[in-house]
A protein has these predicted regions:
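Extended, folded cores of ATP/NTP-driven motor/assembly subunits in large transport
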Residues: 2-418
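P-loop NTPase motor domains
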Residues: 63, 70-89, 96-100, 263-265, ...
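Hydrophobic anchor at the beta1->P-loop junction of P-loop NTPases
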Residues: 455
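Conserved lysine of the Walker
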Residues: 463
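Hydrophobic positions on the alpha1 helix immediately C-terminal to the Walker A/P-loop
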Residues: 466
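Post-Walker A helix-loop "phosphate-sensing" segment adjacent to the P-loop in P-loop NTPases
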Residues: 473-483
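A short helix-turn-beta junction within AAA+ P-loop NTPase domains corresponding to the substrate/partner-engaging
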Residues: 499-503, 719-732
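Conserved P-loop NTPase
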Residues: 747-800
């Protein structure tokens, strides 16, 4: 026997509200539900609009049209024409562009950082205020969505379902060819879209379950209908508390710009734009145009006869007649030989506002945009209810004002502008403002297939600042552990503010406090590798270390690799048998094991190792004496000098890998920032090990970020190019001319996109997030504690100290 789940207070409130809207005060009076013209909505998203017309709905995302160069724009435009040509006369479709203001509370929750009991809430509050300030610069308060609703006529829903699903598959595939992400909406999703339009005066979220219908006797309309409709005026109407007006676009210009639709959708108020499109049967269209040409030719002959009778030149005919004749012949040629179809289009705009004056201002603004392109906006006098119905994404057009356009004429209303990167969930971090739309860029690298990242830029472009901003944001928002390899001692101030550890490595072995500070490069965590034997990956690391130590131009010889690998397995035997700290080997154990080998190559490597064991560079010949337990740890290797810096970076990388393996068991992410990353990629074996670690990080919950100004080093070999291929996140700041050329070729950056990293200001560039490319600007407010902690400018750093 099944037990029914108890309704929550919010669910009860939603049902009570629906019941109150369902009650009629007068049997003769229409209810708000009566103005919503569909018969039923099914769970899988099929809407029966009339007895014989059925529709489905697809939401599609944006792509970077405005950011593309002319060649790419033409390619997108041609692809959109092909997309439109798919629809024959049996399939009506509707393009809906819905811009609705989200409640301030909703957006505040999205960007605010929840407090924690760790002593850093003052910085969280400051960061939240910064985000709110950046939010106000754009129109992130407006949620923009795009939909395609398509419908067919059928005898019943069973027949309609099969055909709609086939068309749906074709449309999704056609969107994929354009590089556009799209998904089909189910019944609940469609009802939510209708609810958001019809009840935009309400702050209550959409609350609905199919289970409630049989239990309450309500219909789906009762959960989406506004409190009332009032259609008692010629040019506007009331929908709940909102003042609304529907207008249509009169297309008067012979040619239109591809920016028309974009300009309408850039209006910073609630607006719903719809294009109802009906394909005309190709044979009928051609016949109609031929008939028109024949009629025009007859008129031309009549005019010529009149001219002869009147005694003037028969070639002088009315200019309109000549123009119409030329246009008709061009249209016929388009349909017959230029892959064009004929469409009938109705272009509707629904403006809404809180007051009548504000509504008039919105309509005036809309009309100004239309007039800029030699078009007119005309309100639907005494047809506001029909206009409202036609503005709902149901696939029903009750306005019989249509304009005939060819495929390219319809395609000029390009539905793509710029991609946005705004993920409204708690793990999303701030990366600046979209340079095209002024909207916040907030994303979570963990959502990428491969969260590994690169921060690239010339000196002074803001690389270190950008890294510090992400570090701070990640520390305040997530519980991730954060490690930094710091070759220039730039991160200590920030790390100390977050009560982190700075481990200073120097040739003398003295840390920040003057006490000995050692890291053992031979430290091994038994979970070091996926394999049963953790020594395999550790051996790769030690080979990389020895390659740096030997310093040969050609790397280690095969025999040298063999003897090192043999000795590695020998020196770890005691620890593997009894894994206690005192059994952990150090470099001296490796040195002694090499000395015992007979091969001359072993003696050669041992001799090279000697200075790091008993000579002046023996800082790494000790067991680790630092208890690394902070969430944020900085390895300051500035004082290691040229001889030890690369070795220090490699050892730090290995230490972080040990922490990654520990954190994986705790289901915790580990972020690792490597400044001057190119230094690890110059030697073949070291580069090979770094690339292997780079690949492994993702599987083990690691999020590495390489920071460098040297792009050429990143692309120095086919193997090193794997770093790019395994990095779905690239934060690209200003680039030198040579590097721009390399990056454009490798990442497929268009000349127009490249302009955003050409002589750009500090904190400006391109963000690559998966397949999305967005130009950004990050002007972090200087009057904040965080800015003073993150800046690398000496005069500004003095203020902190």
């Amino acid at each position: 026997m099944s037990t029914r789940r108890k309704l929550t207070r919010a669910e009860k409130k939603a049902i009570e509200g629906a019941i109150s809207r369902a009650k009629k005060t007068d049997k003769k009076q229409k209810s708000a539900q009566d103005s919503i013209p569909y018969i039923r909505m099914t769970v899988d998203g099929i809407c029966q609009v009339t007895q014989t017309h059925f529709t489905k709905m697809i939401q599609f995302r944006d792509i970077n049209y405005q950011l593309s160069d002319n060649e790419d724009k033409q390619s997108i435009f041609d692809g959109w024409c092909d997309f439109l040509n798919y629809f024959d006369s049996s399939v009506k479709f509707q393009l809906s562009f819905i811009n609705l203001t989200a409640s301030e509370e909703t957006f505040a929750q999205t960007i605010s950082i929840p407090p924690q009991e760790d002593g850093f809430n003052s910085i969280r509050d400051e960061y939240t205020r910064m985000l709110q300030n950046q939010l106000s610069k754009g129109n992130n308060g407006i949620v923009k969505t795009k939909y395609l609703t398509f419908g067919i006529d059928a005898d019943n829903i069973r027949v309609a379902k099969t055909r709609l699903e086939r068309i749906e598959t074709d449309i999704i595939n056609n969107f994929k060819r354009l590089g556009v992400a799209a998904e089909v909406l189910n019944g609940h999703d469609r009802l939510k879209v209708l609810h958001d339009i019809l009840r935009m005066d309400s702050l209550e979220p959409f609350n609905f379950s199919w289970d409630w219908l049989p239990r309450t006797g309500l219909s789906t309309k009762d959960f989406i209908a506004p409190s009332s409709f009032l259609f008692n005026r010629a040019k506007d109407f009331r929908m709940g508390k909102k003042f609304c007006s529907v207008s249509f676009l009169q297309i008067l210009a012979p040619e239109l710009s591809d920016r028309v639709l974009k300009d309408f959708l850039d209006i910073e108020s609630n607006i719903v734009v719809n294009l109802h499109v009906q394909s005309v049967d190709q044979v009928s269209a051609i016949k109609t145009i031929k008939r028109t040409i024949t009629d025009l030719d007859k008129s031309k002959i009549e005019e010529q006869k009149k001219a002869v009778r009147a005694g003037y030149d028969m070639d002088i005919i009315p200019s309109d007649l000549a123009t119409y004749g030329a246009e008709a012949k061009k249209l016929l040629a388009d349909l017959q030989s230029r892959n064009q179809r004929m469409f009938l289009v109705t272009f509707l705009i629904l403006n809404t506002a809180d007051t009548k004056r504000q509504l008039d201002n919105n309509i005036f603004q809309t009309n100004s945009i239309a007039q800029k392109y030699n078009c007119n906006i005309t309100t639907l006098d005494y047809q506001q209810e029909e206009g409202m119905v036609s503005s709902l994404p149901l696939g029903l057009n009750q306005i019989e004002i249509q304009r005939g356009l060819t495929s390219s004429g319809v395609a000029i209303f390009v539905p793509f502008t710029t991609q946005e990167l705004f993920q409204g969930h708690e793990g999303a971090l701030y990366y600046g403002i979209n340079a095209l739309s002024n909207n916040l860029i907030m994303v979570d690298r963990k959502k990428l297939k491969n969260p590994n990242g690169l921060i690239l830029g010339t000196p002074g472009s803001g690389k270190s600042f950008s890294a510090k901003r992400e570090i701070s944001n990640a520390f305040l928002v997530t519980d991730d552990d954060i490690f930094i390899c710091d070759p220039e001692a730039e991160y200590q101030t920030l790390v100390e503010r977050f009560n982190g550890q700075t481990i200073k490595l120097s040739p003398t072995g003295k840390g920040n406090d003057g006490k000995p500070c050692y890291l053992n490069p031979l430290d091994l965590n038994l979970d070091y590798s996926d394999e049963d034997n953790p020594l395999s990956l550790k051996s790769d690391f030690i080979l990389s270390l020895c390659e740096l130590i030997v310093g040969s131009k050609d790397g280690l010889a095969p025999v040298e690799k063999t003897v090192i690998d043999r000795c590695v397995r020998l020196i770890y035997q005691d620890y593997l048998n009894d894994p206690k700290p005192e059994n952990m080997p150090i470099l001296e154990d490796l040195y002694n094991a090499l000395r015992k080998q007979e091969e001359k190559e072993a003696q050669f490597v041992a001799t090279a190792l000697e200075i790091y064991v008993s000579g002046s560079l023996n800082v790494f010949n000790h067991r680790t004496n630092e208890d690394i337990n902070s969430r944020i740890v900085c390895y300051d290797i500035k004082e290691l000098g040229k001889q030890l810096k690369k070795i220090g970076m490699l050892i730090v990388q290995d230490q972080v890998w040990n922490r990654v393996t520990i954190n994986r068991a705790a289901h915790k992410s580990t972020r690792y920032y490597i400044d001057e990353f190119h230094l690890l990629l110059k030697e073949e074996q070291t580069a090979s090990y770094s690339i292997e670690i780079w690949k492994r990080f993702r599987k083990w919950g690691g999020i590495p970020t390489g920071i460098t100004q040297n792009v050429k080093a990143l692309l120095s070999s086919r193997e090193v190019e794997n770093i790019f291929e395994n990095s779905d996140f690239i934060y690209m700041l200003n680039q030198a001319a040579g590097d721009r050329k390399i990056l454009a070729q490798h990442l497929g950056i268009s000349p127009h996109q490249l302009s955003y990293v050409t002589h750009s200001n500090e904190g400006e560039g391109l963000l690559f997030y998966g397949d999305t490319i967005v130009p950004f600007v990050d002007q972090f407010p200087k009057n904040t504690e965080l800015y003073r902690l993150m800046t690398t400018k000496p005069d500004e750093q003095k203020e902190v100290k």
